[in-house]
């Protein structure tokens, strides 16, 4: 099985398309998103993904908590991206384990309830001139990290 990206209530079509594009580029062959309260696949998604949608499977889930449980049962290492944590993603080495990367909403990130269920919460180290990265940029950096570690 391949690496997976799990989106939790991403709302912006451009972010969604860019995440799909990065997922295809870095061998994250499945993108999961909630059935409700999430972005839709639109013509804009196709355009921004630049062919990524043809190389990535989109899977819808009902409950993120059930999904986390299923992924762990399939031996995925569940990793969330957040700003307020000590663990720098560049130090994370999962020794070729399958990764399920969790990306929270643009507004509020991953909820504390979700974070508690994941194996690891990590951040992208950056200069403090900027408070945060765009969700699709952060997702792309994290996917590239795991792609390089598995190459």
Please provide the spans of the model-predicted regions.
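Conserved sugar-transfer catalytic core signal across GT-A, GT-B, and GT-C glycosyltransferases
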Residues: 19, 110-113, 142
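Short, structured secondary-structure boundary patches
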Residues: 51-57, 98-104, 147
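RNA substrate-binding interface of SAM-dependent RNA methyltransferases
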Residues: 1-86
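Structured adenosyl-cofactor binding patch, chiefly the S-adenosyl-L-methionine
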Residues: 25, 46-52, 115-151
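Short C-terminal domain-edge/linker segments immediately following a structured domain
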Residues: 35-39, 61-65, 109-113, 131-136
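Active-site/ligand-binding-proximal alpha/beta "capping" segment
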Residues: 79-134
């Amino acid at each position: 099985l391949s690496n997976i990206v799990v989106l939790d209530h991403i709302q912006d079509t451009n972010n969604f398309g860019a995440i799909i594009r990065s997922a295809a580029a870095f061998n994250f062959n499945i993108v999961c998103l909630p059935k409700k309260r999430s972005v839709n696949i639109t013509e804009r998604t196709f355009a921004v993904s630049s062919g990524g949608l043809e190389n990535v499977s989109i899977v819808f889930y009902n409950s993120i908590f059930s999904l986390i449980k299923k992924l762990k049962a399939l031996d995925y290492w569940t990793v969330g991206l957040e700003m307020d944590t000590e663990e720098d993603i560049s130090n994370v080495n999962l020794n070729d384990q399958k990764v399920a990367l969790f990306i929270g909403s643009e507004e509020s990130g991953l909820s504390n309830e979700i974070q508690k269920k994941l194996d690891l919460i990590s951040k992208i180290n950056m200069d403090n001139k900027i408070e945060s990265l765009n969700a699709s940029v952060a997702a792309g950096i994290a996917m590239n990290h795991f792609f390089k570690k598995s190459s």
